[in-house]
Design a protein with these regions (language model features):
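Substrate/ligand-engaging "lid" and interaction regions
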Residues: 1-347, 351
């Protein structure tokens, strides 16, 4: 989806009235596979050694940060990486640590490592993964202690937290056909060997939020001009908890489970069902009683937008079946915080 299209992609914003707002995304200068045995590795190392590099962002899903299995055992790829050192990394966290080691060797210029995955405390997850590899290498004598000291210096390396929100379903056949009807060619939707659907276009809703901890030791682009919120870590966490625990994800999961049971094929269709709409409105109302306001985003306005604009949008090809995946793992995060705060609220004595 990069080289055959001259590194260009097409963003298709899907409006509720059926209008497709199309924009060419031309911000990718080169696509390089992070494979230490592949032809792109030398170029990727060169990019990471460049003093002008300000940040590296990650969108690898929450599972991409995991170094252990459900039993707590180190994954085979990570175990091999820890023993082999920074010259032959395979796991994403080891690859990130290896590239940082190359930057350290080239002068140790500052950099921000920014996770933009949709999970709680994403910057912490990235930092822990990188440090797990680096510390294993240091214990084995494969990297000097000075590398760990450099990684630990927040004037040199940071791992900002972020909250990201934009419903972006799998590439849609309907969108593909609409683009082909306009004369665009080679809009093929492909499936990778891991099962991910990819295409030269991305279809998404119009709403978007990105809240970033402002911790960039080598400077940063003026992303606030594009609507990005910059703030401190505590506010990022409040915004993330607001979304994940109250204003969006719990409602999504409720619709997903009932949508599967009642054989719905879209979230928008569920929102046209009076009973299901009342269900998520009630869940939202309960959450609003205890949610902590992050200040930069209004929980009430956020939830009103979700219920009245985002979920009912019939143009979004989002299915309850997609959202229902891994529900058992999501329940503690999406409902646990609100339930815990509600119990505390109930147990507090009423003041006269």
């Amino acid at each position: 989806v990069y080289e055959p299209y001259d590194e260009l992609s097409l963003l298709v914003r899907m409006h509720a009235d059926g209008f497709y707002d199309k924009e060419v995304v031309a911000s990718v200068a080169g696509g390089y596979k992070a494979d230490c045995a592949g032809p792109d590795w030398a170029r990727l190392v060169q990019v990471f050694q460049n003093p002008s590099l300000q940040l590296a962002s990650f969108t690898i899903t929450e599972k991409g940060y995991a170094l252990t299995d459900l039993a707590g055992e180190t994954l085979p790829a990570a175990r091999q990486d820890f023993a082999a050192g920074p010259d032959a990394p395979r796991h994403t966290m080891s690859i990130a640590a290896a590239l940082l080691y190359r930057r350290f060797q080239a002068g140790g210029h500052p950099i921000a490592m920014v996770s933009m995955d949709n999970c709680a405390q994403n910057g912490k997850k990235l930092r822990e993964g990188v440090f797990a590899a680096a510390e294993a290498w240091e214990r084995a004598g494969l990297v000097p202690a000075a590398f760990l000291a450099w990684l630990s210096d927040e004037k040199k390396v940071t791992f900002p937290w972020s909250m990201i929100d934009k419903i972006t379903p799998h590439p849609s056949e309907q969108v593909k056909k609409a683009l082909e009807d306009l004369g665009l060619q080679d809009m093929t939707i492909s499936r990778t060997n891991t099962g991910t659907l990819i295409a030269p276009f991305v279809n998404a809703e119009t709403t978007e939020y990105l809240v970033l901890e402002d911790a960039f030791p080598n400077g940063r682009p003026p992303l606030e001009r594009a609507g990005v919120y910059f703030t401190d870590r505590a506010t990022v966490e409040k915004a993330e908890k607001m979304k994940v625990g109250t204003c969006l994800n719990p409602l999504h999961t409720a619709l997903a489970v009932y949508g599967c049971l009642l054989d719905y094929s879209s979230i928008a269709a569920e929102m046209a069902d009076p009973d299901l709409k009342a269900l998520v409105e009630h869940i939202a109302a309960e959450g609003l009683k205890v949610v902590e306001d992050p200040g930069i985003l209004s929980p009430r306005k956020f939830i009103d937008e979700v219920l009245n604009e985002r979920f009912p949008n019939p143009a979004i090809p989002d299915t309850p079946q997609r959202i229902a995946a891994d529900t058992s793992q999501k329940l503690p995060v999406r409902y646990g915080g609100t339930l815990q705060l509600s119990l505390i609220h109930i147990s507090e004595p009423t003041r006269p």
